């Protein structure tokens, strides 16, 4: 019965007039700036001087009836609903919204510097995003999608060693190994040396499936090849094949205090829980849909009411990163989307053509 009702609502979804769209956009734009419910009187004063207050009030009543705006008990004005924000982001957002010259200059300055890897570049770029949006941002990446560039085995002591994996984005991944009486360190080092020779530029997630071919080569060098591969080597690389590792780092949490929504402790806790929710960042990092620009997801899509995220995926040779701005549903979506789109385009253009990661 509930599904039938939803289907009926979808079928009779009203088609908004141009004036109703303009009223809805004006309400959202005004509420984004002031965080105060918007009245018909205010709209007439600011945007609709050629219309009567009764006309605008009637349009607002229809928008409320259709579910695009709603009344808050603390005021006679109206605020956007999730449905209203969704319609705005799909149909009314200013797609030609430009970023400031200051932002462009600061980003290009970062991209012109010599950093050791892509993560250092994006860390610096995200700090500008934080400052400009006054919101926190999360950078995510999946190590399993990176390529192997080098692998070394370092002996720590008689009982332990460390596998060092250098990836295509110049990150270093480490795995501890216990050395027992059956382990000859030199033989084990031979195993990893052959991997270093044969599997450079292979995705970490695919190495495990290629080890059976490599063991035949190692067998010609050491007698216990099967033992070392089954007990040690496979354990290192099965990790990337069966459990993709997603790393996320949050920047700019301090800016939360600048938003009135988070004076409500429950809403603040909800956002902090979202930032710590590894599940959603894993879904974002492992999302294979790399086409297009920044995507916006509202609270009902991410399981956190009153919150929203805007995500851009940075695609570079052999690696990618996701930058996600997190905040209340009362975000400046046009501005945030423009910033993320510009960041994505410039980083991919400059780093994609000049670096091999």
Curated annotation (Swiss-Prot):
Keyword terms, alphabetized: Repressor, Stress response, Transcription, Transcription regulation
Gene Ontology MF, one: DNA binding
Disulfide-bond pairs as recorded: none
Pfam family, one: HrcA
GO annotation terms (biological process): negative regulation of DNA-templated transcription
InterPro entries tied to this protein: GAF-like_dom_sf (IPR029016), HrcA (IPR002571), HrcA_C (IPR021153), WH-like_DNA-bd_sf (IPR036388), WH_DNA-bd_sf (IPR036390), WHTH_HrcA_DNA-bd (IPR005104), WHTH_transcript_rep_HrcA_IDD (IPR023120)
Annotated function: Negative regulator of class I heat shock genes (grpE-dnaK-dnaJ and groELS operons). Prevents heat-shock induction of these operons.
The family this protein is said to belong to: Belongs to the HrcA family.
Name recorded for this polypeptide: Heat-inducible transcription repressor HrcA
Source species: Ureaplasma urealyticum serovar 10 (strain ATCC 33699 / Western)
Source organism phylogeny: Bacteria, Bacillati, Mycoplasmatota, Mycoplasmoidales, Mycoplasmoidaceae
């Amino acid at each position: 019965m509930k599904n039938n009702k939803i289907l009926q609502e979808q079928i009779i979804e009203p088609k908004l007039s141009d004036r109703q769209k303009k009223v809805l956009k004006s309400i959202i734009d005004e509420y984004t700036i002031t965080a105060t419910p918007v009245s018909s009187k205010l709209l007439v004063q600011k945007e609709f001087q050629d219309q009567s207050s009764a006309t605008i009030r009637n349009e607002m009543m229809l928008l409320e009836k259709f579910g695009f705006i709603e009344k808050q008990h603390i005021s006679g004005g109206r605020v956007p609903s999730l449905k209203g924000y969704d319609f705005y982001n799909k149909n009314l957002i200013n797609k030609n919204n430009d970023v400031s010259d200051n932002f462009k200059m600061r980003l290009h300055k970062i991209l012109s510097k010599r950093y050791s890897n892509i993560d250092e570049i994006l860390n610096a770029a995200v700090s500008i995003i934080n400052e400009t949006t006054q919101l926190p941002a999360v950078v995510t990446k999946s190590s399993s999608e990176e390529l192997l560039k080098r692998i070394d085995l370092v002996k720590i002591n008689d009982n332990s060693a460390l596998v060092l994996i250098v990836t295509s984005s110049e990150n270093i991944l480490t795995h501890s190994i216990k050395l027992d009486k059956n382990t000859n360190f030199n033989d084990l080092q031979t195993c990893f040396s052959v991997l270093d020779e044969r599997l450079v530029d292979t995705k970490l997630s695919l190495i495990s499936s290629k080890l059976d071919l490599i063991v035949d080569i190692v067998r010609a060098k050491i007698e216990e090849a099967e033992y070392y591969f089954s007990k040690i080597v496979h354990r290192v690389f099965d990790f990337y094949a069966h459990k993709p590792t997603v790393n996320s780092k949050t920047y700019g949490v301090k800016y939360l205090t600048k938003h009135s929504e988070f004076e409500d402790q429950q809403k603040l806790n909800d956002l902090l829980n979202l930032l710590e929710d590894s599940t959603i960042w894993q879904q974002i990092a492992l999302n294979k849909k790399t086409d297009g620009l920044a995507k916006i997801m509202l609270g009902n899509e991410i399981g956190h009411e009153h919150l929203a995220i805007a995500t851009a995926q940075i695609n570079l040779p052999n690696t990618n990163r996701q930058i996600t701005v997190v905040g209340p549903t009362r975000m400046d979506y046009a501005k945030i989307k423009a910033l993320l789109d510009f960041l994505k385009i410039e980083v991919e253009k400059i780093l994609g053509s000049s670096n091999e990661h």
